[in-house]
Structure formats: C-alpha cells, structure tokens
UniProtKB/Swiss-Prot annotation:
Signal peptide: none annotated. The active site is at residues 16, 141. Its EC number is 2.7.1.148. GO terms for molecular function: 4-(cytidine 5'-diphospho)-2-C-methyl-D-erythritol kinase activity; ATP binding. Pathway: Isoprenoid biosynthesis; isopentenyl diphosphate biosynthesis via DXP pathway; isopentenyl diphosphate from 1-deoxy-D-xylulose 5-phosphate: step 3/6. Gene3D superfamilies: 3.30.230.10, GHMP kinase, C-terminal domain. Coiled coil: none annotated. ATP binds at residues 99-109. The gene is ispE. This is 4-diphosphocytidyl-2-C-methyl-D-erythritol kinase. PANTHER family: 4-DIPHOSPHOCYTIDYL-2-C-METHYL-D-ERYTHRITOL KINASE, CHLOROPLASTIC. Belongs to the GHMP kinase family. IspE subfamily. GO terms for biological process: isopentenyl diphosphate biosynthetic process, methylerythritol 4-phosphate pathway; terpenoid biosynthetic process. InterPro entries: GHMP_kinase_C_dom, GHMP_kinase_C_sf, GHMP_kinase_N_dom, IspE, Ribosomal_Su5_D2-typ_SF, Ribsml_uS5_D2-typ_fold_subgr.
Amino acid sequence: MTDSTRSLRNCLAPAKLNLFLHITGRRPNGYHDLQSVFQLLNWGDTLHFTLRDDGRVARVTDVPGVPEESDLVVRAANLLKAHTGTAAGVDIEIDKCLPMGAGLGGGSSDAATTLLALNRLWQLDLSRTELQSLAVKLGADVPFFVFGKNAFAEGIGEELAEVELPTRWFLVVTPRVHVPTAEIFSDELLTRNTKPVTIADFLAQQNSDAGWPDSFGRNDMQQVVTSKYAEVAQVVKWLYNVTPARMTGSGASVFAAFQSKHEAEAAKAQLPTGWNGAVAESLNEHPLFAFAS
C-alpha cells in the first residue's frame, strides 16, 4: 500500500472464510442467530482512494452488475460523510478479484476497507467502535472486517471475539454459479437449531491438523446449497478426494486447508480444466487495522 496526503493506493480488501457456520435459531424479525469463526486471507480486491476537492464521492471504475449508487463502497463513503459532516470527497477505484455470490465477503470487505481508508485519508480519527456502528448499517459481515482480527462470531454476526488461529494455506475453489444468500436463508430445509458451542470448544480442536476443517462443526448451509446447485456439490466431492473441504458462507466457494503453499499449489494444479481456484495464506489482522484505534 502507498500512502500520501492526497491518496491511498493498493488497499487490500481481504477475503474471509467461515471455518464453520452454525445456525442456532431464528428471530421473530426473520434474522438468524449464528455462530462462526471468520478467517481473514491475504487475497482480495484492491482499492485506491484519491481526494477530491469538490466534496463528491465517485466510483471511477465500472463494476459489472453493480450500479454505482448501490455499490457498498459508495454507500460506505457517503455514510461516513453524513456521519462526520466532512467536506472532503473521494475518487474510488476498485480492482475486483473476488467473485460475487461466493461466500467470501467481497462487497462487505470492500465497504470496510473504504471506511478504514477514508478514516485515514479524510483525517477523521474515528474509533474502531464508532466505525463498527456505521458498518452494521451496511451489512452483517462489514463489522467483522472493520474489527480487523480473526473472530468467533455470534448473534447475527455482530458479536465478535478475537481468536488466535495458526498460519495455514488455503485452496479456494469457486464454481461458476451465483448463490443468493437470501434464498438459502429462507429455504425450509435449512437447519436452524444447531446446539450452541463455545470458543473453548473450537480452540480445543483448531490446533489439530487431522481432518481439518471437518474436525470441528460444519456449515449448516452446505447441504441446502449442494442440493440446489450441482456445481457446488461437484466441487465439494472433487476436493474431498484430495483433502477435507467445506463451503464458506452461503457459497458458492469451497475451501481446503494445507500446511504449506507448495501443498496448496499442488492441489490447485490438479483442478479440472476451467475450474477457478486461488491459493491464499491466512492473515492475523486486516492490512488497514492501524487506520482505527
């Protein structure tokens, strides 16, 4: 990342994985209670921010399928302007890398990186807690990315506790299919009564490499998604022939963990022709963590 008084360039918006995802209940308002562990990756979209003197917020790169006015990045910047009353403006460039509808948190991560970067570029000096209170207005995953550490999540995903995770390499395979999150959450076959676990339960298992990630918990959405989307089921089945694998979020991406980059790259090299795979290392904290206190 490069930093100047008028621009911040090469700001990573990292992907996340759900190492497990349990749905423990459903609220009267339709929201779901969940438990999960969020893992940051050193792979994601790259954003560039340049000050404008006219106060406007503008996305200067096209993102296919995402109108500028509804882009979470633009909404995040405008929310920050409205909250602080700053007269500053910004041009935002986005180099998209993460697929949409993949369970990797791409749009949410872009929004969080925008909040953190503009907190620095606009010299707002908002606390992390204040930024998280804004982030929750943008989406359930955005507060996690502002939180900036690997986390055990509860509630609707907004109750976060930092967890220390070992360094691992991941192969993430994304089928060429978009899985709408709302469709999966509303499916009558979705399990919504998984027994709650504790952080201690998870930490007791996370240092064991045997059978990881399926040595702890599951993704309650995986069975619903694989029953509806054959492409996802095919990836899960193929990866399981190599090593234990699990879907992240509501899909469609599926991941497997390895002890080294070499092992992950070797597995990627075996992917069938036309499959989209990425190798990424785990992160302990968000690259812009220092942009809020």
